[in-house]
């Protein structure tokens, strides 16, 4: 399996992560995210994303099947970033509420809607539901950068 991954061409790798949900909107961010850990975008439009997040036994913290909140948060974060849908979007902060426990085997659906869009700043509201039960609600603040965050000079050199 590992050998197969290494032998993929860059084009094949890109195609695997490339997603067009309708004729006009394509996913431009988080294209290499692990869908098994963070879910998959199933709907995408300007300022909106829907992510389906099927939970697995590897995410459980105990024998009862309780899913660790970090996995739930990761899927919500992915939905928020997909709603912004800019290549260099980064999360700045979040205020989240875990409203009901998530159990192994449940598929949580996250809907993310951009609520505020001014210049580089974006506020995104995310709701996660299992069936009709709201399990997560959060507000995310993101910033869209000119280039990848690792290519920015964030601090002055000590020599200056």
Task: Provide a role label for each language-model segment.
Residues 1-58, 154-160:
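Non-catalytic linker/capping segments at the edges of enzyme domains
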Residues 61-65, 92, 147-148:
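A short, polar/proline- and glycine-enriched secondary-structure boundary/capping micro-motif
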Residues 35-37, 47-49, 90-94, 106-108, ...:
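A generic structural signal for short beta-strands and their flanking turns/coil linkers
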Residues 2-20, 88, 103-104, 115-160:
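HotDog/MaoC-like acyl-thioester-processing domains
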Residues 55-57, 100, 144-146:
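Non-catalytic surface loops within mature trypsin-like serine protease
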Residues 51, 94-98, 112, 126, ...:
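A structural signal for short, well-ordered beta-strand segments
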């Amino acid at each position: 399996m590992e050998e197969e991954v290494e032998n993929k061409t860059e084009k094949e790798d890109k195609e695997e992560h490339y997603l067009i949900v309708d004729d006009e909107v394509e996913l431009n961010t988080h294209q290499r995210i692990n869908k098994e850990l963070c879910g998959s975008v199933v709907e995408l439009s300007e300022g909106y994303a829907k992510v389906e997040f099927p939970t697995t036994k590897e995410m459980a913290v105990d024998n009862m099947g309780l899913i660790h909140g970090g996995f739930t948060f990761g899927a919500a974060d992915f939905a928020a970033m997909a709603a912004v849908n800019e290549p260099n979007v980064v999360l700045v902060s979040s205020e989240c509420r875990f409203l009901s426990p998530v159990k192994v085997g449940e598929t949580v659906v996250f809907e993310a809607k951009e609520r505020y869009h001014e210049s580089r700043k974006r506020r995104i509201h995310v709701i996660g539901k299992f069936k009709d039960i709201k399990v997560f609600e959060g507000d995310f603040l993101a910033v869209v950068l000119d280039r990848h965050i690792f290519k920015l000079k964030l601090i002055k050199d000590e020599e200056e």
